[in-house]
């Protein structure tokens, strides 16, 4: 798979043609990315803006990019039945645990334990 790696704060971005394809779990979906934006958050993290950088758990090399669209390439055994391989999709990059007080109130966007694709997790 192709990817843009950020190898370190303020280091040049690197284009990688042979990045490993993630292995999915039974309840996950693999999306073949067709388009991905690099937004202000990505640039701020790359520049090392302290307040923003310290709010994420970033390991380098990082694959930024949380604004994306693509097609479903693979479905886990327990993926939702309304999804199909080849379907065009986008996704919310925020994961949530459904156990914290915010999730209980439906405010999953501020979950206490929310990893984020493109920052905490590879984009």
Locate the predicted segments by residue.
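Short Gly/aromatic-enriched secondary-structure transition segments
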Residues: 45-51
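Glycine-rich beta-strand-centered segment in the early N-terminal region that forms part
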Residues: 21-36, 51-101, 109, 120-121
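Short, solvent-exposed secondary-structure boundary/capping segments
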Residues: 43, 82, 111-114
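Cys/His-coordinated zinc-binding microdomains
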Residues: 104, 115
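Short N-terminal binding/cap micro-motifs at the start of the first secondary-structure element
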Residues: 10-15, 40-41
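Residue-level recognition of beta-strand termini and adjacent short loop/turns
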Residues: 8-10, 25
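Cys/His-rich zinc-coordinating "finger/knuckle" motifs
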Residues: 46, 107-110, 118
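Short structural boundary motif marking the start of a folded domain
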Residues: 1-4
């Amino acid at each position: 798979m192709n990817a843009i790696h950020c190898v370190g704060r303020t280091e040049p971005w690197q284009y990688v043609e042979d990045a490993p394809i993630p292995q999915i779990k039974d309840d996950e979906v693999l999306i073949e990315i067709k388009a991905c934006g690099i937004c202000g958050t990505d640039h701020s993290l790359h520049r090392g803006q302290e307040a923003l950088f310290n709010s994420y758990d970033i390991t380098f090399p990082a694959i930024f990019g949380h604004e994306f669209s693509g097609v479903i390439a693979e479905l886990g055994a327990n993926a939702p039945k309304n999804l199909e391989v080849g379907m065009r999709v986008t996704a919310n990059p925020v994961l949530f645990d459904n156990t914290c007080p915010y999730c209980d109130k439906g405010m999953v966007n501020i979950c206490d334990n929310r990893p984020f694709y493109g920052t905490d997790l590879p984009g």
